[in-house]
Amino acid sequence: MNQQPLPPQSERRALAIGRAVYEAFQDYHAQFSQITARARQRFETRDWSGAREDAVARIALYDHYISECMLRLRAVLLGQAHDRALWMRARTHYAELLTGLIDQELYKTFYNTLTRRYFRTQGVDAQIEFIALDIEPTDAITVPVARHTYAVSPGRLTEMLVRVLGDYPFEVPYAHRTRCAAAIAVRLLDDLAHWGEHPVRSVELLETVFYRERRAYLVGRLFGEHRFSPCVIALVNDDAGLRAEAVLTRRSDVAQLFSNSRSYFQADLTTVGDAVVFLRSLLTHKPIDELYTMLGRAKQGKTERYRTFFRHFQAHPAEQLVHADGTPGMVMVVFTLPSYPLVFKLIRDRFAYPKTMSRAQVEGKYELVFQLDRIGRLLDAQPYRFLRFPKARFSPALLQDLQSSCAMSLSEDGDDVLIALCYVQRRLRPLNLYLREQLPAAAHAAALDYGQAIKDMARNNIFPGDMLLKNFGITRHQRAVFYDYDELCLITECTFRDWPTPTSYEEQMAAEPWFHVGPRDVFPERFALFMGLPSSQLEAVKHMHPELFDPQWWRDLQARLREDDYPDTPPYADAQKLA
């Protein structure tokens, strides 16, 4: 696009803006790296509470540095903060600074965020933002990510794995490095026996160690004669010392490790885009936005999610946005494009009884989720502001519902609809529908995992509030995940009570409690009434997870959590652990 030259003073100002934004992103990136690098020490010293604090602090960095950059720019802009011609030239100068950078897309997203704050952009503004819906940004990345490569001679797999573990030293020694290597080798040979007599010919592992919760991961891939698979070695540092706990080679298992229902990894990567390219070779079906997000680059994940969705949206002009499958919510209106696996959630203007929270409280719940260890049970929900859709793309029923129920979030601009705030999540099959649709064995397994999901969340100080099946979904790996957060709270905030024994016939037959119930009172013995499970599945859940219905179990767990004693929740089944 040809730009009109600016007066010399304005040109210098545009150059200064570009330089200031560039330096602000570098400052952000340096602080991001500093926090991320602490993950190794947290792991070595078993400082799990410090690791949780770092995860929360790192998420807050982005908005902090955007705000700080706006303060820096006050002295440069001198009353020209909304001068479009100035920002157009600043974008040109900024782009020149990014030439040759692997992670220039991260820099561009930072710049876009800044301009949207200044201009309150509704939709996108191609004149002052970096917009490229028609490209896949990682396609231009050809520099290989830093990695270790190991050749494997027949019969010497254990020897090679001893060398691998030695190349990733920690301040705490391995409990028994050779024994760990031998256990990994046995599992690899067992998992890959169908590849032939000597299945592993070489191994590649990223130099950067990935950390999350209580584990460190060596992430890479292994090659046979004609094929390759992921290879992720999970390390733990517990009372037994530093040791290898598991090795994952199936793509489905690694995909669950990188699931967007988990918290972000702490991986101190020099550059991110080349790592995303590598990870995509392992997880070919994983959307690029989820990979950026799982590496802690949530804003870039949002950018890529927007880019890929709207590219698909424009390529299917006849398809309409419709209500998502499932029971309509009292707090949210949820819609989707049937051919694309996302849902868009808008807060209703008014909530039906018995919902009593405010709009601000609902937004606060969704913000809280970002600060929690989601342990594979809470679906990532990214907020988007001022999305623009053609009005004609909404089905009549959906448009009418949005106009009548979500007027505070909706406005019209000519032939377009603007959405002030919505939350975007991966689309899952609602659990209540899934249980009706599946054969008995699959439904039984899903019901049991639903119980396990509640237990996993509880052990990480998360209480879902509303346990109805419609608030849970099933992933493509048949895992139950919670995704409706308006009643979510912390276990440590609740009061878990026994249900009083009736003392009269009237109390026994009362439809409502005959005793005072506080706003945070929870009665686990009554959970079965609110789950909505068919009787056979409910009995199975009670048999497999009886503690869920025991008030004392919840009180004991609450006491542990208040002492910052969080039970460990491994991201894989016990059967996957090494002998």
UniProtKB/Swiss-Prot annotation:
Principal cellular location given in the protein's record: cytoplasm
Cellular compartment(s): Cytoplasm
Key words, A-Z: ATP-binding, Cytoplasm, Glyoxylate bypass, Hydrolase, Kinase, Nucleotide-binding, Protein phosphatase, Serine/threonine-protein kinase, Transferase, Tricarboxylic acid cycle
Active-site residues from the entry: 380
Keyword set includes Kinase: yes
Catalyzed reaction equations: L-seryl-[isocitrate dehydrogenase] + ATP = O-phospho-L-seryl-[isocitrate dehydrogenase] + ADP + H(+)
Binding site for ATP: 324-330, 345
A single cellular component GO annotation: cytoplasm
Cited InterPro entries: AceK_kinase, AceK_regulatory, Isocitrate_DH_AceK
Enzyme Commission number(s) of this protein: 2.7.11.5, 3.1.3.-
Gene Ontology MF terms in the entry: [isocitrate dehydrogenase (NADP+)] kinase activity; AMP binding; ATP binding; phosphoprotein phosphatase activity; protein serine/threonine kinase activity
GO biological process, one term: glyoxylate cycle
HAMAP family: AceK
Family from the record: Belongs to the AceK family.
UniProt cross-references to PANTHER family, sorted A to Z: ISOCITRATE DEHYDROGENASE KINASE_PHOSPHATASE (PTHR39559:SF1), PTHR39559
Function: Bifunctional enzyme which can phosphorylate or dephosphorylate isocitrate dehydrogenase (IDH) on a specific serine residue. This is a regulatory mechanism which enables bacteria to bypass the Krebs cycle via the glyoxylate shunt in response to the source of carbon. When bacteria are grown on glucose, IDH is fully active and unphosphorylated, but when grown on acetate or ethanol, the activity of IDH declines drastically concomitant with its phosphorylation.
NCBIfam families cross-referenced by the UniProt entry: PRK02946.1
Protein name: Isocitrate dehydrogenase kinase/phosphatase
Organism encoding this protein: Xanthomonas campestris pv. campestris (strain ATCC 33913 / DSM 3586 / NCPPB 528 / LMG 568 / P 25)
The gene coding this protein: aceK
